[in-house]
A protein has these predicted regions:
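Hot-dog-fold acyl-thioester-processing enzymes
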Residues: 2-94
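Catalytic-pocket segment enriched in acidic/His residues
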Residues: 81, 86-87, 96-101, 108, ...
Length: 157
């Protein structure tokens, strides 16, 4: 490759479109993390923060906030860049947003989750690259995923 860093990155990434990434490591959702998130967001609903009452609720246990699951998706090892290679000249990646977010299955406290990504598109925008990656949060031992969303990442060169 002999183009600019952005041109080289586009070529590299276009070769990976549609290919699933390796899953991240499993990450346990603890009651402490759920409580901390509840404190930060002021969402103190009992299905999240009251383990005794939550046992009697519709999920049989306390569950993580959907927004907590989505937030963690970006920061699991590899996060929003799951499957993206090292790109020459890349200075940083910026979380630009999310498309088509769906919370399909609640994550119970104590469950382990991981992310799998699949690169959907790469486009140059405003002197940066915009990368759209389909992200799936899987729950260990459960067939139905917790969340599927498209992360929109801007890469600065």
């Amino acid at each position: 490759m002999s183009g600019t860093p952005i041109e080289n990155a586009i070529e590299t990434l276009n070769a990976q479109i549609g290919q699933p990434s390796q899953p991240t490591d499993w990450f346990e959702i603890t009651q402490e993390r759920v409580n901390t998130f509840a404190d930060a967001t002021l969402d103190q609903q009992w299905i999240h923060v009251d383990p005794e009452r939550a046992k009697e609720g519709p999920f049989g246990a306390p569950i993580a906030h959907g927004q907590l699951t989505l937030s963690i998706m970006s920061f699991l090892p590899g996060g929003a860049g799951v499957g993206l290679p090292s790109l020459d000249g890349m200075k940083l990646g910026i979380n630009y947003g999310w498309n088509k977010v769906r919370f399909m299955n609640p994550v119970q406290v104590g469950a382990k989750i991981r992310t799998v990504g699949k690169l959907l598109s790469v486009e140059e925008k405003a002197g940066m690259l915009e990368v759209i990656n389909e992200m799936t949060i899987e729950i260990e031992g459960v067939d139905k995923p917790a969340c599927v969303a498209q992360s929109v990442l801007r890469i600065v060169f």
